[in-house]
Each structure stands twice: as structure tokens, then as C-alpha cells.
Design a protein with these regions (language model features):
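C-terminal scaffold of the Radical SAM
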Residues: 1-289
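Short, hydrophobic-biased segments on the C-terminal half of alpha helices
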Residues: 11, 297-298
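Charged substrate- and nucleic-acid-binding regions of tRNA-handling and nucleotidyl-transfer enzymes
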Residues: 271, 298-300
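Mobile late-domain/C-terminal helix-loop "cap" segments
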Residues: 282, 290-294, 310
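Short, amphipathic alpha-helical interaction segments positioned at domain boundaries
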Residues: 320-336
Length: 336
């Protein structure tokens, strides 16, 4: 792990060699038990503007299952330190951990809300092969995450966060809405505390990844660096690219990804021209008539998956139910 001084050195190098735009978001991700008050102050002085803490849960037993080393009591302390340093704050939560009850999840949500951070992320647990938890699930030592349980927990998160003044701008991300945000009509374009880093992915912007294992995406090209830090450093010393492999995306894949990512946001995506809406367009009926006369879009509205009023304005914006079934909505919009 890089310490504060090393992170500051990297940021200084980027500023001198490439340049950092005025007002740019510069986020530091940290485990609650690896940061200090002094380190957060130094990070802010170096140019970091935001810190995201991996809280995950407020329940000790769940943290143990997730192999997290911090205690629940540590999180409000480091959040307060970050605020005092002048950093925007965020916490990441995970739901669906084996053994987690709905009451456990509610306790974690209420704890996170009590810290009054600017931003909260709530991710469903992904059990990956090759991990300790993946092996435990495969052996039957831990139960497989239950989709219905995860849906109930997401609905609870949406309700509690909404009541507390947090607005969703991407399925897993909620931001504390300021007065200016509310006046703007809840467009994530204007959310002061929405993560620019997250939005870059959901809006299909280009990005460059630096460091071992980092991924980059520019236009139709996508590539990733070698994962081993020693191999990464050796390539740089030898004047070689650290890129290990890559791919060129065809137009169909790019369109699928644009829809799949864009539909996850509270801005939604334009319906016109999508494969699932072209039948009405080609018939000369226009999208509005297509919505009213049946077809995929009308079915999505009838099933309560996309907002009907937004669809009549030409945009697909997910309802709460639609957020739970976003992959299905994507397939329908793509005409699969």
C-alpha cells in the first residue's frame, strides 16, 4: 500500500507533467484502519479533494465474514478527521453477505447515515472464484447470496437513504442532495457530491488507468496493465509499455455497453434509435406513438420498470423496480 507521502508525490508528478484541471475531483480510497488524522490533512494539502472509506458494514460479525480488519467504531472517527481536513466524504457499504440479516443491514445503513457523509455507495456482494469466500461458498460452508434477500435490502437502502435526503444518481450510488441540487430538478449532472469518477464510467467517457493491473478505455480501444508490481516497474525501467493485453471493441459491443451503463443512471438514456424502439420509428409512428401502441417500451412501462412520463419525453429512466432488473431492461432496449 502507498503511504500519504508517496500518494502526494504521484499527484505532484501528474500535476507537473500532465496537468490537473481546476476543480477536478481527486479521490483517495482508504480502509478505516489504515489512515491517520495527520495523513488525511497531508492528503488534502497535496491536492486530494475527496476520500472514500471502505466501511462495508457496522456489524462486527459481518466484517469478520468479509475479512475486514477495522472495527465499526473506527469509521465515524476517520470520517470526522476527513471532514476536519476539508475533504468530501463517502463510505462504501456491501449488502448480501452470508449471515447478514435485514436487521444487520438496517443497522449498517443507519450507522452510515449518522456519519452525515456527502456520498454513500451500496453494493451487492459479488462472490468471486479464487477467493476465500468463493471457496467457502463452493464447499457449502457459506450460503450462496439470495437474489430476493438482496432485492429487499436494496429497497430498504433506497427508502432510508431517500428519507435522509440522499438521491440516487446511479443504481449503487447515492449522494447527499444540496439545495442547489434540489432546485436543478434532481439531474445527476448537477449533484454537487456525485462522484465524477463513477460518472465517467456510466457515461462511457474515456479514461486512463495508471499502475499495476489498471484498465484504460479510449474510444474503441481497451487495454490493461500487468498486475505484478515488480513486472510493472521493470517494464517502465526498460522503456516498455506496461500494457499487458487489450482489445478493440466493435460498434455493436460499444452500443451495448453504452446502453447497459447509461441506463443505470438517474439521467437515463435516449430511447430514439435504440434497437428495441426502432420498429415503431421505422413504421413512421414516432416514439410517442410507439410507447402508447404497445411494443417493448410500452411493456417496460406496464411492468413498472421504466418511468412512463420520462419515456414520453424520449428517455428511459429506471423506476425502483427497474433498478432491480436493470440487465433485463437493457436486453429489452437492445431488442434481444
Amino acid at each position: 500500500m502507498l503511504d500519504t507521502a508517496e500518494l502526494a508525490e504521484i499527484l505532484t508528478g501528474l500535476r507537473e507533467r500532465i496537468g490537473i484541471a481546476p476543480g477536478a475531483e481527486v479521490t483517495l480510497e482508504a480502509n478505516p484502519d489504515t489512515v491517520t488524522r495527520e495523513g488525511l490533512v497531508q492528503s488534502a494539502n497535496a491536492g486530494f479533494t475527496r476520500v472514500s472509506f471502505g466501511m462495508q458494514s457496522a456489524v462486527p460479525a459481518i466484517l469478520k465474514t468479509l475479512d475486514r480488519t477495522h472495527t465499526p467504531e473506527r469509521v465515524p472517527l476517520v470520517v470526522q478527521w476527513a471532514k476536519e481536513a476539508g475533504l468530501s466524504t463517502s463510505v462504501d457499504l456491501i449488502y448480501g453477505t452470508p449471515g447478514e440479516s435485514l436487521a444487520d443491514w438496517e443497522a449498517s445503513l443507519r450507522a452510515a447515515l449518522s456519519y452525515e457523509t456527502d456520498h454513500i455507495s451500496a453494493y451487492s456482494l459479488v462472490v468471486e472464484e479464487g477467493t476465500k469466500m468463493g471457496a467457502q461458498v463452493a464447499r457449502g460452508e457459506l450460503p450462496t447470496p439470495d437474489p430476493d434477500d438482496e432485492a429487499a435490502k436494496y429497497e430498504l437502502a433506497d427508502a432510508l437513504l431517500g428519507e435522509a435526503g440522499y438521491a440516487w444518481y446511479e443504481i449503487s450510488n447515492f449522494t447527499r442532495a444540496t439545495d442547489a441540487d434540489l432546485a436543478s430538478g434532481h439531474s445527476s449532472t448537477f449533484y454537487a457530491h456525485a462522484s465524477a469518477h463513477n460518472l465517467a464510467y456510466w457515461r462511457d467517457w474515456d479514461w486512463w488507468g495508471l499502475g499495476p493491473g489498471a484498465h484504460s478505455h479510449v474510444g474503441r480501444m481497451r487495454w490493461w496493465n500487468v498486475k505484478n508490481p515488480a513486472a510493472y516497474a521493470a517494464r517502465l525501467r526498460e522503456g516498455r509499455s506496461p500494457a499487458y493485453a487489450g482489445e478493440i471493441l466493435d460498434e455493436d459491443t460499444r452500443e451495448l455497453e453504452r446502453v447497459m451503463l447509461g441506463v443505470r443512471t438517474s439521467e437515463g438514456i435516449e430511447l430514439a434509435g435504440l434497437p428495441g424502439t426502432r420498429q415503431a420509428d421505422e413504421a413512421g409512428a414516432g416514439l410517442g406513438a410507439g410507447v402508447a401502441s404497445g411494443g417493448r417500451v410500452a411493456a417496460l412501462i406496464a411492468d413498472g420498470l421504466i418511468d412512463g412520463a420520462a419515456a414520453l419525453r424520449g428517455r428511459a429512466i429506471l423506476t425502483l423496480r427497474g433498478r432491480l432488473l436493470a440487465d433485463y431492461v437493457t436486453r429489452e432496449l437492445m431488442g434481444y
